[in-house]
A protein has these predicted regions:
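Residues that flank catalytic or metal-binding motifs in active/ligand-binding sites
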Residues: 26, 47-49, 60, 121, ...
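A short hydrophobic beta-strand segment most commonly corresponding to one strand
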Residues: 51-53, 119-135
């Protein structure tokens, strides 16, 4: 129930999308990262929202890094100069993972993890969410599990 509440809060209140609150967790897996371990740059095409819950962090566990989609713009584009660094104009944002914390982000957002330090470990549970009903105003469709 808690994960569902976090999902709907993120999708509806944070991102501002119109959606039902009901969702499926389509995938869920445990990550145990030993010293020097990392995750390469990737996204989750099978999810509207992805997330990671940090179960145990020890030593220098390495943060999750989110890449700004604007850092690889489609051409042509208009370049601008950064006035002050924000989450919207930086090339990437450090997710600063913390034990007991759940991070949610759009599933299509490229991300990776920094390597864990010596004598460090990071244990997390990652997941992907899909809404039970997709709606685009005049039409909608339901997602079912088989």
């Amino acid at each position: 129930k808690w994960l569902g509440e976090c999902y709907s809060d993120f999708l509806i209140d944070v991102q501002g999308w119109q959606s039902t609150q009901d969702a499926f967790i389509t995938d869920c897996w445990v990550n145990v990262t030993q010293p020097g371990g990392t995750q390469v740059v990737h996204s989750h095409a099978n999810a509207i929202v992805s997330g990671t819950y940090y179960v145990h962090m020890e030593g220098a566990p390495g943060d999750i890094i989110f890449q700004n989609p604007a850092s690889a713009p489609a051409r042509p584009y208009i370049g601008t100069q950064q006035g002050k660094p924000t989450a919207f104009n930086c090339m990437q944002v450090n997710g600063e993972a913390a034990e007991g914390e759940l991070k949610l982000w759009p599933g299509n957002l490229l991300h990776y993890t920094e390597p864990t330090g010596p004598q460090s470990v990071r244990v997390s549970v990652s997941m992907n969410f899909m809404p039970k009903v997709f709606s685009a105003g005049g039409y909608y469709f339901r997602v079912t599990r088989e």
